[in-house]
């Protein structure tokens, strides 16, 4: 694909720019130790993933801290250990503390020299504001679950994204969506007819982590392992005529 053929990039934030699995595990692991569960971070994240997606589906207007707390409590029920209010609040309040991936800030700064950058995220505004202190990026637009009253993979974010593109004077065909989660992003991006890049942050680990396995069709146009790889590929594309091939695997 020719990365120089696009004018804007829309990003999922958590899992793509911010290491939400590390942030969630930083609460789940000490809780498991306290309640006597001999489970590592990967197994805890796998137990948690479906619960968060279920809460988001059933309560689309719930604030994200509330989603986190409720999903944590349900995970405790699944694992046979209660989650107290203090632990639930600890996870719910933790979003601003979740770390950025090491390459995110520099890659965004580089990509911003070529594209308008937009955020399409399953979070609340205050949570993203805290996260952007780690990313240090001026985005052309930020679309959150709080703004659209729903959580991906529902299509609300992408409908709002298209309205934003109209305001920015950018055609849909000039937008490339960039995300890690097949479930949350590449399924609805396919439905919306968007080209997309899969940032496969879990390329060196088995399983799905904090993200459910997708049950609907998904596709992507390019797979990369990091945001740094995308920034380097964009620099190369804008420096010369050669594009970068990389077909995805349609489901």
Question: Where are the regions a protein language model picked out?
Answer:
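Asp-based, Mg2+/Mn2+-dependent phosphohydrolase catalytic module
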Residues: 1-6, 105, 109, 116-251
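N-terminal helical cap/lid subdomain that shapes the substrate entry/recognition surface
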Residues: 2-102, 113
